[in-house]
Amino acid sequence: MAKERACRHCHYITTEDRCPVCGSRDLSDDWFDLVIVLDVESRIAKKLRESIPEAAKVPGKYAIRVR
């Protein structure tokens, strides 16, 4: 099973070597807590974008904190 890593730029969680959302290769194994965004127009997605501007632009799993 592939290890999930979080993008340091947009916080998207992926098993790939490149972030499918922003294209960054700067991924981390050291991330905490996650939010699953189904609707990018939801209040939670908008709140997430307030603290992480690049986050929650597409549905998926996002890390709250990435080191």
Swiss-Prot record:
> Does the record bear Transcription regulation in its keywords?
yes
Q: Does the keyword Iron apply?
A: no
Q: Which SMART domains has this protein been placed in?
A: Spt4
Domain of life, per the record? Archaea
Q: One Pfam family this chain carries?
A: Spt4
What residues does Zn(2+) bind to?
Answer: 7, 10, 19, 22
**Gene3D superfamilies, from UniProt?**
2.20.28.90
Q: What happens when the gene is disrupted?
A: Essential, it cannot be deleted.
Quote the InterPro entries the UniProt record gives: RPABC4/Spt4, Spt4/RpoE2_Znf, Spt4_arch, Spt4_dom_sf
Q: Which GO terms describe its biological process?
A: regulation of DNA-templated transcription
Q: Where in the cell is it found?
A: Chromosome
Subunit architecture: Heterodimer composed of Spt4 and Spt5. Interacts with RNA polymerase (RNAP). The complex interacts with FttA.
The name on file for this protein is: Transcription elongation factor Spt4
Q: Which gene encodes it?
A: spt4
